[in-house]
Amino acid sequence: VQVQNPWRRAGAKFGTAGRLVIMTTVAALLVAAVTVPLVGLAGIATRDVANTFNTLPVGELGAAPVRSVVYDAEGHVLTYLYPNAIYRVPVDYDQIAPVMRNAIVAIEDDGFYNEGALDPRGTMRALVNNTGGGSLQGASTLAQQYVKNVRVLQAGTNQSAVDAAIYPDLQRKVQDLRVAVDVEHQMTQQQLLASYLNVAYFDNNAWGIEVASQVYFSKPASALTLAEAALLAGLVQSPTQYDPFTEEAAATARRNTVLTRMWQLHYVTKAAAEAAEKQPLDLKRSGVPGSGCTAMTALASSVGAGFFCDYVEHVLELDYPSIWKEINTTGGLAIRTTLNLQDQRAADEGVNYVEPNHNGYFNPGQNADTEVLLTPGTGAVQAIAIDRKYGQDDIDYAVNSEYGGGAGVQTGSSSKLFTLVTALEQGYPFGHTIKVSAPSTAGPYTNCHGGYVNPATFNDSEGPTTGTEVWQMNQATVDSINVYFVNLEKEVGLCNVVKTAVKMGMTRADGRSLLAPDPSLGRNRFSADNLPGFTLGEVNVAPMSMAAAYASVAAGGMYCSPQAITGIAVISTGRQLPVQKQDCYRDMSTGVAAAASYILQGVLTVPGATAYGRAISHHAAAKTGTADNGYYAAFAGYTPTLAGYVSVFNPTNPT
């Protein structure tokens, strides 16, 4: 039962029509007060001013910003992204405890259920005071407060916009009132009350009742008790002044004021209010969660998904600029990614494993170990793992620099894939022989412009160290014979090898084409078709690019660019937003892909091969790569359903 004051009873006698007349009349006077001095009001027809109020432009209030959610492929939450760093979790009317709904109405707008967007008594008082030159006053109903808070939330970190939203001049009151009236026409009372509680500020970075319930009591808004609800309702008038963490006495007194008002309005009995007043505050503080990849869920953190998350953020920023803007302004989006938690956990464990008898060979603590896993035929990024703690080192060494990566890595002999595929495309048989010696001088070569490329001399760590030997292509691949491949590169054409790599999705680590000049120091200032050592991994690339290239062989010659996002939806409506189409194309014939896979299986199965003994129960193929006496190492491997690339390198000196 609610106690009605005389003003509300007067309005109630006329029913809805009577309340509308009162509201419009007072609104008309309020508009007049903005435009003319009080002494001139007598000469203005109320009807004319009312018409002016009714024709004021409403404008589009828009939605209050809300968090976006990033999911893995199976729907597990990875992290939340908060617009303007504001953590807000809207809840429905039924998810807010009735005592909380009653408490906020009792203390902030006891005429909520009768007067609507306008408080006539308060507005008339403000009208007389403001036009008479006194300090600015204003009557703010829940509807008006809702409008103001939405505007503050939308302003975010723009202080001038925040000031414009809360500056208490009479003109702003009129504007807010006009929008508030429109809001009331669009919402039911239940919707408006829930909406207000979802945008109210409760101090300590707690926007909305659900977050406030968690921050102060570590419970959902649906579970609030009478005493807890009264404390939170009392906060909104002056959140800092009544902060229970720092101002316990003031907060307690304010809570008790709310309880008194609740029993006066018959929301609770006097006995219940007095019992609640005797209770201690009993706070159970919880912090507001952080935003983004440094504040992932426990599940995502446990599998080391920080660098995958970072890649997703960069993809959103670069490839979905309008979506990224929406995430950072209004939010409310659900982003479905390709992350596979099982694969991510396995990759994370792999890169953080330290060989017990390494004897310093792999330079632990200085070298970085990265692993990328992709799905052949789709390009879905299953995992990105780096042996670094995300947040302490935010460089995602697995990806191109434009997506948050570094300067790329040496690939060593894993780049022999491109020469092998080129030879197979030109019809070279598995048993194609080349007589080689070590050291061996190969060349001259011809670049893609028909230019002359000087011969170069190469040594070999796996093949002959002295004398001359004859090697067949398949055996030279599994044994990774450098001097064979630089000569094979000469035979099939250096330009053709580089073009094969480009066709298989390869770029430099900064995203530029391999055929474009590189302005960096040393030999890398030339395009890749001027580098005889290209087949030995002379150009720095991102591990993800190598994983995608090998995945195309696993997919039977179908290249698919890496894809980390499969769906984006508006949480409130479920409406699906467009995502980039899968970029897949044929980069080699199925026959060439099958032939390459057959040869690369031998890396795992042929005795004496570089990865012999590492075979698994599935059909699998692989290629190893090393540089600088093993201080840089790479391993590419794939099955029909999964392709991966592992790289160990020194990030302070990747070349």
Locate predicted features.
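Peptidoglycan glycan-strand catalytic modules in the bacterial/periplasmic cell-wall system
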Residues: 65-269, 389, 478-482, 489-493, ...
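Non-catalytic structural connector segments
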Residues: 269-336, 345, 351-355, 361-367
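Mid-domain, small-residue-enriched loop/turn segments at the edges of structured enzyme/sensor domains
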Residues: 449-453, 458, 493-548
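Glycine-rich, acidic and aromatic/proline-enriched surface loops and short helix-turn segments
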Residues: 145-155, 198-205, 222, 226-238, ...
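Conserved catalytic neighborhood of penicillin-recognizing serine enzymes
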Residues: 132-156, 291-300, 428-497, 531-534, ...
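N-terminal type II signal-anchor transmembrane helix
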Residues: 1-70
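A penicillin-recognizing enzyme superfamily signal
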Residues: 333, 337-363, 371-373, 383-387, ...
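Short, well-structured active-site flanking segments
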Residues: 113-123, 207-209, 270-272, 424-448, ...
